[in-house]
Amino acid sequence: MWLLLRRAYPLRILLPLRGEWVGRRGLPRSLAPGPPRRRYRKEALPALEMPVSPVTTTEIRQYLRAHGIPFQDGHSCLRAPSPFVVSSDIKNEKKDAPTSFCLFIDKTTGHFLCMTSLAEGSWEDLQASVEGRGDGAKEGVLLREGPEAEVREEVLRIWNRAIPLWELPDPEEAQLARVMFGLTKVTDDTLRRFSVRYLRSARSLVFPWFTPGSSGLRGLKLLGAEGQENGVQYVETTIPRPGVYHNLFGLPLISRRDTEVVVTSRELDSLALSQSTGLPTLSLPRGTVCLPPALLPYLEQFRRIVFWLGDDLRSWEAAKLFARKLNPKRCSLVRPGNQQPRPLEALNQGLSLPRILRTALPAWHKSIVSFRQLREEVLGELSNVEQAAGVRWSRFPDLNRLLKGHRKGELTVFTGPTGSGKTTFISEYALDLCTQGVNTLWGSFEISNVRLARVMLTQFAVTRLEEQLDKYEEWADRFEDLPLYFMTFHGQQSIRSVIDTMQHAVYVYDVCHVVIDNLQFMMGHEQLSSDRIAAQDYIVGAFRKFATDNSCHVTLVIHPRKEDDDKELQTASIFGSAKASQEADNVLILQDRKLVTGPGKRYLQVSKNRFDGDVGVFPLEFNKNSLTFSIPPKSKARLKKIKDDNGLVAKKSSSGKKGAAHQNPEICLGQDPSPAQPDTSKSSG
């Protein structure tokens, strides 16, 4: 083993290639000189502008066969002999046939991981190693980076200060901790097997992250409990930060002979399941937020994987998404319900966890033959109406009253006049969802990512940070922890490159909301047709198909066609043919009256809502200091009838909901009219 040192660069440990197919081409591109990076830099999505096509499973198989490399076809990875392991190391292990096949190659991305040496790299790195030529030059592949010295010291300091619950000197303190975390029925033996400790100073449970195959400590997760009016809320802190914390809690207890595993979203649930069923259990490091592809090799050995992630529809949707990564044919899902709560709650309620596991539904079926396969899904939506409506905005309550929420698999088209603040509004719109755990990918083709990030950081802090630079690091650290990613594209790009990047983001980062700003700037290089309208229709159709196939919400910003300044924009004002509005599930229009009357109000109009048909208009107020939109404080007035284009008064909504009307009747939120004057408000209001 040898070390590579660079001035002003972090220490990198590399492992020389061993075995029959050793390459000799120099270092991988990941070690090329470049600017020093921060310790916890959020990875930018790779730009696909370069002539590098995404690899397919067929291409990987053909490449391995062409170079005489044996491989085994797995569920989500291909297994091959590892060139990073000395043959004597393999002989020292148990002589199982699959033991030497410890190199896992992801079928979707081509990324590889050696389970024995922990060497990893991209598909291009692996190709360079196989095809390399040269005399005497040694090839190296980057090992998965361990924690830096500062992080390692902090991990050891906390771990050494933490003690097992049963060793607490005060029995009342131990009992209080058990009650606080719901562990009254979890035995000391279970806590001991999973090496769970308790940090008295922080009143937190401590869950360890051990290096696979050894007892080395790589990180920790601290779980604190805060009392709320509606129960206990758990607060998680990971060391290192969430983006690099890849701990499958319970992995050291898994043996090679295990063929079935139950996957949970919380460590507490894994404790309850293991104790009640005796089955192997694993807990995902970031719960229902994402399943990093780096963890897939550790799940390859299982023939059956049961997801029991939680008791709400969001957990159910996450389970279905994760099953697609792992091959749905081997996955089963525990449906949320009154008699099927979280595993820990089920244990505390005296329910039979093995019985609940037997009710798990297969994640894959060839076809729907009758209502029988759908009835439980329908019941779930009827029983959880608010959750079925999607994630609700915290900054735009009137948008919740109209759209009800942000749902996966939908296409939203957003338009507004030039200079009205479309990008500023849609950035806050997406940021609101991102702060609630909606993994978001931004494709900004008109303005740079630096400028966009500056706007979003200002909106996140709700203050101008240029006037408070001493607080920048604090807010930047909090902003960096958001599940937010940016495409590195700028200007005109082909739809194929953009879709490839979006699919990569969905697979690697579990992105469920993509923002494209905007369509006209992106489609400049589209050579599908000389007819610009036809090209736009094709692109809109591609985004529609992507949203449906990947269960990912796509928000598409489109400039309107040229209209007179004294006229309001309509759905027909969207540039191009009617295909954009036809394909869209939601159509949002930012109406800007200041272009006609001078400085004035802006309104957000929901002109299409496929979910339940409610449409309407509500006012916005722009705060220049925080770059945010908010509802004017004086808008707390009754709903008013407005006239349609024919001068007829729209009928009152039959739903009776404030701020909502069915598809054609629009409702405007405005001030109460004076009692001495008739109500003369119009839809432009």
Curated annotation (Swiss-Prot):
Residues 122-373 are annotated as: Required for hexamers formation and DNA helicase activity. Its EC number is 5.6.2.3. It is an enzyme of class 5 (isomerase). Residues 385-636 form the SF4 helicase domain. PROSITE patterns: SF4_HELICASE (PS51199). Gene3D superfamilies: 3.40.1360.10, P-loop containing nucleotide triphosphate hydrolases. Pfam families: AAA_25. This is Twinkle mtDNA helicase. It comes from Mus musculus. The lineage of its organism: Eukaryota, Metazoa, Chordata, Craniata, Vertebrata. The gene is Twnk.
